[in-house]
């Protein structure tokens, strides 16, 4: 009997569902000959990098304001024809077949949303067929490291309807002994922050990723609020709970200038702003500190701050191994944000993570601002021993679903579970 007996793909179906913003996205099911079923849902970003794989939308103004994904759903039928009868255990072969079927560099024909939904659903089906949790199927026996969460508790930029320029102000429980405790610490700081905001007469409505979205006088004020909340919750800033930012600077870059807090800056001035913030606050990670194509200044930023703080490329690298390789060769950044839908297949995502690891770069597994109840990224973080995960704040169930999945994984691992903050895989507190 062949090793892949029963794991052949028998059927692939897809449907249009809604994400956390009420916009359509793609859900796929992969059915195997042995009756195993894998289900996956694809997220969608608000601030998207220019070089991301193509998210196929219908552009029909009569449905969902043109945001429908019926074309992508229909394209899954063509994918099914190409993959039927193949083994779900051959993830790389299946992903290559879909890439070849699409025939474009950015998956524009079939849509990265169609391809990724099938890619992930296939992995889930294969894991189910082997009676393994997804993290164990993908990561093998060494998949036992729980990531330090980057908790986006103050939202700005494209993720919120407020006047804050920087997109995310995050807390990282780097000093916690376990993921369970890290989650508790984060939740306590989140609720302390709510009280701090109320006491100051500031809004406590939340943005796309579940963080608060008050109007503030400056980006620095957001950091001050986080320090106040951390201390109010009984923790030590830096040592126990560190700070991180997603500047998302491409969103306020125009004609060679960065405009934040109402002032336009040359690239050197923007680097100076970030350096000042790092010197004044216990910041351990900065994402997209400069514009996605500003490679020369990214190199300068890395030379100035790379030994002090984690510099994460999101729009810069877009989970693309070719762009990451360019960054490695030029000495740009020291970490890569991993978003499955930026590249469009599980295989290419794993290749990017592997390249980062071999090159001394860290990987941060990430959600998108438009999410679903899918928890694949939680398993991916553990499978790859990435050590860090970005999956939003401590509210909105599409964010909490990932945290709760990590709690279940930690419980299943028992005494074999390691928390990245406790063993030094996450950014160090200072």
UniProtKB/Swiss-Prot annotation:
Name of the protein this chain belongs to: Enolase
Record keyword Secreted present: yes
Gene3D superfamilies assigned to the protein according to its UniProt record, in alphabetical order: Enolase-like C-terminal domain, Enolase-like, N-terminal domain
Cofactor: Mg(2+)
Assembly behavior: Crystals are solved as a homooctamer, a tetramer of homodimers; in solution is primarily monomeric.
Localization (cell): Cytoplasm; Secreted; Cell surface
Keywords assigned by UniProt, alphabetized: Cytoplasm, Glycolysis, Lyase, Magnesium, Metal-binding, Secreted
